[in-house]
Every structure is written in C-alpha cells, then in structure tokens.
C-alpha cells in the first residue's frame, strides 16, 4: 500500500503544469497545460463543426427541392416542413445545452449526438435509395403527393438527424472555448479568435454544401448526394476521435436555471426589506469564487442595475454576526443568494433585448433560405452550358461572409483597435447594430427584385408550370446584391453574439448561452410559416395573376 501511495504522488501533476481554470481530462484528472487544449484540440472540434454544418445545410437547404419535386408536396407544405424540422432541431439545443451545463460533460453530449446523427443519416439514405420509398416521377403542374408511409420514413430520418445536430451545435462551441485558459493572457488572446474561426469553418461548410452537394442532389441524384454526405460525416467523426486526448473539460456545476429561480424567489420573499446604502453589505462568499456547491464560479461585481433584485442578497438582522451555518440554511431555504447569483440573473435579463432584436436579422436570412431559393428556381440559371441548382445561389452569400471575416480579421481589425481601443475593434453591441442595418438593406433589395420578377411574369403572361420549369426571362444574377448584403450580416451578428454571451454569462451557463445564440435564428420559423401562407394555402411564389 505504501509503494502504491508513493507512485500516485510521483505521477500526480504538479500545480505549475495544471491549467489555471481547473480544467480536467476525460478521466477526471487535472489537464496538463503543455499537452492539452489551445488550437491543437480546437482543430479537431472544427472538424466536427465542418461535417455537422455541411450535412445539415446540404439536407435542409435543399429540402424544399426534394419535397416539391420528388415527394410532390405543394410548395407551402414543403416550406412548412423545412420550418418545422429546423425549428424543432434548434429549440432542442436549449435542452442539450442545459444538460451539458448542469449534469454531464459537453463531450458526452457530443458523442451521444453523433451516434444519433449517424442513425438519422442511415434512415435518410435508405429513404432516397430504396425504390418502394420513392414515389413515381411526375412532370405535371399538379402531381399526387407521396403516400403517408413514404413521407413518414423520410421525416423520421430528418427528425432524428436534426436532433443529433441539435446536441452537437451548442456543446461543441462551449467545449471549443474551454480549450483556452482565460486565466492565461496568451491563451485568452488566442481564445478570442475561436468564434471568428468557427464562423469561417461554418461558412466554408455552407459553401461546399450549397455548391458541390446541392449539385450532386439536383443533377446526379439524391441517392448519390445523401450517400456522399453520410460518408463525409462518418469520415469527419473518425478524424475527430484522434483529438480526444488533447481536450480539456470543465466539471458540470449544477442547474443554472435553479440559481435564477432562487434569486427570483429570494427577492420576492425579501421585498419588504430595505436595501443597504452600501452594496458591499450585500451577501457574498469570501474568496475569488462564488459558487455554493463547487466553488468554481468567478465572482461578479455588484452593479446598480435592476436594484430590486438585490433584495435577494439582503441579510436579515446583524449581517456581521450571523453564523455561517445560518447563512447556509437561508440559502438552502431559498431566502438568500450571493451577489454573484443576483448579477447572473441581471445579465440574463439585460441581454434579453439584444437576443430578441437579433431575430430581425434572421427574418431576412429565413427569406433567403426558402423564398429566395424558390424565387431563383423560376429564373434563368444558365452559366454557359451549365445550369446550376436553385439552392446553389446561396453560395454568393456564403462567399460574402468568408470575405468579410478575412477582411475584418486581417485588414480592418488593427486600425479599428487603435481607433476604438476595443480588443476586437468594434464592440459586440456595435457589430450587432451593423448586422441589423445590413439585414434591413437586404430586405429592401429583396423587395425590389420581387417587384421586378412579378412585372416580368405579368408582362410575358407566364403560367405556374412555366415558373416551375424555370422559364422566367430574368437572370438569377438579380438576387446577388441581397445575397452579398446578407453575407455581411451573419459574421457581424453571429460572432458578436457568441463573444458577448461567452463574456457575460457565468461558467455554469456556457453551453446554454451558446444554445441561445443558435435558437434565436429559428424563432423566425413560426413567423416565416405564417407569412408564407396565403388564404388559398400556397406560398407567394406562383405566377401572379394578370390584371
């Protein structure tokens, strides 16, 4: 026994080699700072980001083409299906983000989600490959829809793969940012770039999906397209396995929603108690951290905002003389909270308007995905002897996003830092405002293009069948301005939200905060669903009636 104890002491990692933020390995031991984390670990997570985004966009972005042209569903039903799948998948990210923060490591959520994703892809490949799951071809203006059996199999594969993607998206963001120690100035500086590079990888996956994979599905076949996507996903997951040993992890610290609820209850119970004149008299734990259970959450300084919530941290009686066990009893009874816990709720409430306003940008993005793609499908899409698929037009927006990221990070960032003094050139709030400005400009440009499209259809008396066959005498290049403007929006608003939420939310809400930045994109699915429906049950995409 003595020799075993000596061996354990010899192999224990010295404090100077440990990560300053308390990161651990997958086995629960302290991580070696020199052998884990940073870009070495993040690069393997970027592989997961790439294949997840590639497959998800390649399926959902071209989903309306499959539902309308192969399953023979009407355009409204196809668009609604896209909205339902995307919306349910993204709302599920809240649940997975909560689980990763409260109960298990983000790594295990990612691992389980990849398995679910893989199963969903198998179902999708089978649904587009087996003859009895593919309805007969139809070239008429109105075709009988696929049977409920065929639709159910396809939608089951969509839903399962969507749930897998929902588990990957927020947790890979939080796990990726955990690879950089914020207590180390050098690593913290590198970590600031993590979200920008994440968006670059994400947009690169989108570019490949909307060009090569959309072409595979439309011109070669959905069987070949889906099979290639599944193979790419499996290959990416296998590659990412080699990076497991480099990953750093943070222990879950309990339910963050419980803390928020405690503050509300305690503030309500103490609403009659007067606030102290000095904020330092409010209750807070001693030391640098403020977490009751695991003592890991860094303290947040008291602020003068939303002072009515400070009542949750008001001590009864003589604050200095109250024994610590009495304070702990009050905490357990939800009658007392720390200043840090109160400030966490303040952060959530103050960021809500920012989160809600971000929806307006994604309203414009939603139109690009459904309305814009179907808009282009009726136009002239010839490039020489090659006719590109309608959804491929989205690559213009993606290329614009990649260009903006490169220009901002390598050209504009340095002079902007000197001008504003902000380490990221422009603050997240300013970039959010710019993103919303470009979103408004996008909608204006889209309206002008639609006015032109309608006038051309009416001038040439084009029928619905001619629109479906892409016979509108109008070049698809008309939609390029709105797509380029939309390309500026995504990296501006997307990276701003990720940076702001990671900066403001506490350590026990990292995955949940990342999920919130993703969910906001699909809150517009409901509005898109309502706006896309007309009294006759169809989208505003058919040929307008003359007169």
List PLM regions with ranges.
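Hydrophobic transmembrane alpha-helices of multi-pass solute transporters/permeases
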Residues: 2-136, 144-547
């Amino acid at each position: 026994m003595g020799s075993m104890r000596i061996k354990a002491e010899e192999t224990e990692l010295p404090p100077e080699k440990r990560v300053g933020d308390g990161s651990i390995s997958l086995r629960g031991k302290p991580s070696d700072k020199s052998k884990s984390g940073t870009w070495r670990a993040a690069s393997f997570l970027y592989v997961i980001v790439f294949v997840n985004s590639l497959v998800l966009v390649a399926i959902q972005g071209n989903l309306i083409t499959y539902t309308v042209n192969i399953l023979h569903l009407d355009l409204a039903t196809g668009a609604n299906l896209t909205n339902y799948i995307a919306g349910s998948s993204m709302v599920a990210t809240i649940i997975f983000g909560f689980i990763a923060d409260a109960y298990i490591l983000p790594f295990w959520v990612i691992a389980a989600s990849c398995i679910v994703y893989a199963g969903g892809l198998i179902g999708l490949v089978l649904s587009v490959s087996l003859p009895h799951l593919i309805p007969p071809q139809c070239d008429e203006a109105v075709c009988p829809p696929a049977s409920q059996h065929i639709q159910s199999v396809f939608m089951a594969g969509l839903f399962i793969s969507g749930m897998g993607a929902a588990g990957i998206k927020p947790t890979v963001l939080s796990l990726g940012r955990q690879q950089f120690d914020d207590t180390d100035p050098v690593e913290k500086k590198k970590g600031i770039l993590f979200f920008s590079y994440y968006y670059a990888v994400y947009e690169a996956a989108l570019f490949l999906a909307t060009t090569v994979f959309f072409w595979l599905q439309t011109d070669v076949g959905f069987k070949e397209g889906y099979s290639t996507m599944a193979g790419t996903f499996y290959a990416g997951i296998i590659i990412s396995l080699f990076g497991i040993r480099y990953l750093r992890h943070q222990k879950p610290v309990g339910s963050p929603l419980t803390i928020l609820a405690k503050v509300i209850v305690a503030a309500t119970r103490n609403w009659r108690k007067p606030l102290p004149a000095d904020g330092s008299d409010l209750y807070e734990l001693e030391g640098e951290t403020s977490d009751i259970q695991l003592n890991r959450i860094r303290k947040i300084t008291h602020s003068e905002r939303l002072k009515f919530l400070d009542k949750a941290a008001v001590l009864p009686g003589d604050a200095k003389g109250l024994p610590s066990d009495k304070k702990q009893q009050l905490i357990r009874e939800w009658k007392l909270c720390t200043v840090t816990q109160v400030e966490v709720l303040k952060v959530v409430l103050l960021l809500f308007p920012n989160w809600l306003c971000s929806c307006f940008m994604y309203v414009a993005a939603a139109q690009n995905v459904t309305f814009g793609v179907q808009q282009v499908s009726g136009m002239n899409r010839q490039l020489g002897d090659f006719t590109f698929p309608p959804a491929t037009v989205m690559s213009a927006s993606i290329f614009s996003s990649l260009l903006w990221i490169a220009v901002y990070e390598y050209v504009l960032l340095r002079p902007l830092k000197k001008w504003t003094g902000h380490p990221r050139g422009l603050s997240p709030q300013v970039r959010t405002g710019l993103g919303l400005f470009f979103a408004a400009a996008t909608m204006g440009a889209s309206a002008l293009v639609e006015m032109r499209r309608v006038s051309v259809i009416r001038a040439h008396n084009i029928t619905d069948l001619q629109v479906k066959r892409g016979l509108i005498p109008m070049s698809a290049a008309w939609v390029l301005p709105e797509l380029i403007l939309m390309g500026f929006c995504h990296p501006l608003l997307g990276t701003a939200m990720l940076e702001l939420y990671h900066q403001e939310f506490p350590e026990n809400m990292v995955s949940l905060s990342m999920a919130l930045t993703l969910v906001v994109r699909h809150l517009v699915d409901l509005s898109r669903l309502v706006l896309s429906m007309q009294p006759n049950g169809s989208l505003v995409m058919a040929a307008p009636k003359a007169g």
